[in-house]
Amino acid sequence: YIHERDNWTNFRWDASEVSILREVVCRKQGLLYGRLSTLGFDSKLRAMAENLTHDVVYSSEIEGISLNEEQVRSSIARKLGIENVKYTAPSHYVDSVVGVMLEAVQNYDQPLSKEKLCAWQTAFFPTGFSEACEIEIGQYRTNEEHIVSGIFGREKIHYIAPSPDLLESEMQRFIAWFDGEDTVGSVIRSAIAHFWFVSIHPFEDGNGRLARILSDMLLARGEKSELRFYNISSQINKDKNHYYDILERMQRGDGEITEWLVWYMKKMIDALDEAETIVTTILNKSFFWQKAASVPMTERQTQMLNLFLDGYEAKITSKTWATLAKCSKDTAIRDIQDLVDKNILIEDIPGAKRPSYSIVYDAEDLTQFFTDVSIIEENGIQYLKALFKGKKTICERVLKLDAERYQKGDLPLANLLSKYCSYIAAGNRDL
């Protein structure tokens, strides 16, 4: 195994192959933070809260642990001081896990220590048990650690971690590197830290989650920001079989980790693309409420609009409204008609037998600003591509349902552009 080699942490990689992807990551980071600069502080906090919710939930899911997403979202919102969020009382465990993530990213510039790592690992296992098995918490493991799969008696060994008597020296070296000079850039350091930490495997359990938190810390240091708007955990969770396969190959290797760095940075690119979608949603939602703030609405109408503004994937119909709002269909029809009369909703196809509606983000017809509109697909994701005012090509990720409805003629172009491009038109009408 890799740790059995002399100077095993003198990792090597193909600089030309890695640098190409690193440049893509850095460019996308710059684009994301450029867009975020247009948001107010409250909107930035909401974007961060949504990202951290996904980070905490998916980082746990990678390890086979399911957390209640609404509890996580509520815990993060409360700790960040975000108001007007539907509150679901979080369990003590969820609060503890959220606390670890927030402590790490909000204090990214503080030194790492054994004590800090042990405290974080304890927070993951407050009862001292993992899957009904008692484990060592708050200290480095004192037992040999074999990473295995398969049924009892026919296990397959994937990796044997360093022996317990080596952990103190191995972790001292890791922590010194972690807090030392950055010579390769935060993106590559983030990937190396992840691989290095899980290869030491200092704790009996919780190593994967800690590795991902440490990766986020290094990215925060590189960006010099405690506000986190993208996470790699959700992308790893989508491809976790490949994740474990690459780790196993690298841990049986000789320190040449190009494959790991390439895979990791591709996941970062996916994470940044997903973050762009969240930011677009928040920008359009913010633009909508600036226009609609003075329009009188019931609490139910406001809650339902926010649900769809946040990207809930469904057509707005009286049936859907009644189901989600837990009200009668007659009440739903009255709610919707009232919003149509106030120019908050618009019927997609006037006179349709089963009418559906779209939110009016912008009262102006945006088809006058956008030409050459098409729906394209990349890696299973749909995008709206168009030319804005004959000068700038834009590409916005759209919900699969919206793409399908537009292509079938069920969703007018004006309504599609209003939903995904209002913030663009709002800030650039004088171009």
Predicted regions and their residues:
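FIC/Doc superfamily catalytic core
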Residues: 1-389, 394-400, 406, 412-420, ...
